[in-house]
Amino acid sequence: MCNILIPSNMKTGIKKVKLHVKKNDTVTVISGNDKGKMGKVLKVFPVASRVIVEGVNIRKRHMRPLQGQTQGRIIEREFPIHSSNVKKS
């Protein structure tokens, strides 16, 4: 038996898809709650076909208190949207 390392995405049968946008591209949202907003692509997830766009799809994230902190906090950050919902500007 050979000890061959197989990437995890090949084990599950998920293929990496080439997206029409890259990091630092300026895009416009064409559908969803943030339709019409423009922003810069911060991060791309090719396997999931999702992108994070600056200022789009902002959600509140509740953070637990850490050992040194006495209080938790709520932060607002961008969450991924599907790449089919954006177009290059």
UniProtKB/Swiss-Prot annotation:
Highest taxon, organism lineage: Bacteria
Protein name: Large ribosomal subunit protein uL24
Family: Belongs to the universal ribosomal protein uL24 family.
GO-annotated cellular components: ribonucleoprotein complex; ribosome
PANTHER family: MITOCHONDRIAL RIBOSOMAL PROTEIN L24
Organism from which the protein derives: Chlorobium chlorochromatii (strain CaD3)
Any GO MF annotation of the entry: rRNA binding
Job of this protein: One of two assembly initiator proteins, it binds directly to the 5'-end of the 23S rRNA, where it nucleates assembly of the 50S subunit.
GO biological-process terms attached to the record: translation
Record InterPro entries: KOW, Rib_uL2_dom2, Ribosomal_uL24, Ribosomal_uL24_CS, Ribosomal_uL24_KOW, Translation_prot_SH3-like_sf
Keywords: Ribonucleoprotein, Ribosomal protein, RNA-binding, rRNA-binding
Subunit structure of this chain's protein: Part of the 50S ribosomal subunit.
